[in-house]
């Protein structure tokens, strides 16, 4: 079977209004893909920024996958959460990116969005640290079928650095250029 090694890190979150952030991530792929080694989901520590508009995570990724088909190519999903002084957390950004289909080093910027408040009370609650609306199903992140019904706001960006190693794809007639 062909193999993909994903080695890298979720570097940081930039341009978020909230000062204390952490990131949940997961790697989604099709049915033909199997995890050989590593973790396909995780969570970073809480990172704070005072003067910059950047929260550094340096969350390592080390995932080894095998596949019999290129269908269902992996995608990296990120959810950024804010934390207040009462240790309450709420989502401030959702986003995803497909893992590049070329080997080598890649620096990716994942644009994120959040669910827009749908009233005055929810706007006030979000502004003064009570939290915003959350998605009940994360498949709405990458499925456009139901996502178009949501009212959303642009959020910050998550910077990811990936080193990709591909093995045995040439044996299956797949060439990467």
Swiss-Prot record:
The keyword Cytoplasm applies. GO terms for cellular component: ciliary transition zone; cytoplasm; cytoskeleton; MKS complex. Keywords: Cell projection, Cilium biogenesis/degradation, Cytoplasm, Cytoskeleton. Its main location: cytoplasm. Residues 2-118 form the C2 B9-type domain. Expressed in chordotonal neurons in the antennae (at protein level). Expressed in spermatids (at protein level). GO terms for biological process: ciliary transition zone assembly; cilium assembly; sperm axoneme assembly. It comes from the Eukaryota. It is found in: Cytoplasm, Cytoskeleton, Cilium basal body. Disruption phenotype: Simultaneous knockout of B9d2 and tctn is viable and does not show sensory behavioral defects. Males produce motile sperm and show only slightly reduced fertility. Sperm flagella show weakly ultrastructural defects including broken and disorganised structure. Length of the transition zone is decreased and recruitment of the tectonic-like complex compromised. The keyword Chloroplast does not apply. Belongs to the B9D family. PANTHER family: B9 DOMAIN-CONTAINING (PTHR12968), B9 DOMAIN-CONTAINING PROTEIN 2 (PTHR12968:SF2). Probable component of the tectonic-like complex (also named MKS complex), composed of B9d1, B9d2, Cc2d2a, Mks1 and tctn. Probable component of the tectonic-like complex (also named MKS complex), a complex localized at the transition zone of primary cilia. Has a role in ciliary structure and function. This is B9 domain-containing protein 2. It comes from Drosophila melanogaster.
């Amino acid at each position: 079977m062909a193999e993909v090694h994903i080695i890298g890190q979720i570097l940081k979150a930039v341009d978020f209004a909230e000062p204390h952030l952490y990131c949940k991530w997961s790697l989604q792929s099709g049915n033909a893909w199997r995890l050989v080694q590593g973790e396909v989901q995780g969570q970073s520590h809480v990172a704070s920024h005072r003067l910059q508009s950047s929260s550094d995570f340096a969350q390592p990724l080390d995932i080894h996958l095998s596949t019999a088909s290129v269908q269902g190519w992996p995608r990296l999903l990120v959810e950024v959460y804010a934390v207040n002084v009462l240790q309450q957390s709420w989502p401030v950004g959702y986003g995803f990116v497909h893992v590049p289909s070329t080997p080598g080093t890649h620096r990716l910027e994942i644009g994120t969005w959040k669910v827009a408040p749908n009233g005055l009370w929810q706007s006030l609650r979000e502004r003064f640290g009570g939290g915003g609306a959350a998605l009940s199903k994360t498949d709405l992140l990458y499925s456009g079928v139901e996502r178009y019904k949501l009212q959303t706001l642009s959020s910050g960006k998550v910077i990811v650095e990936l080193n990709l190693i591909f093995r045995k794809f040439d044996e299956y007639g797949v060439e990467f250029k």
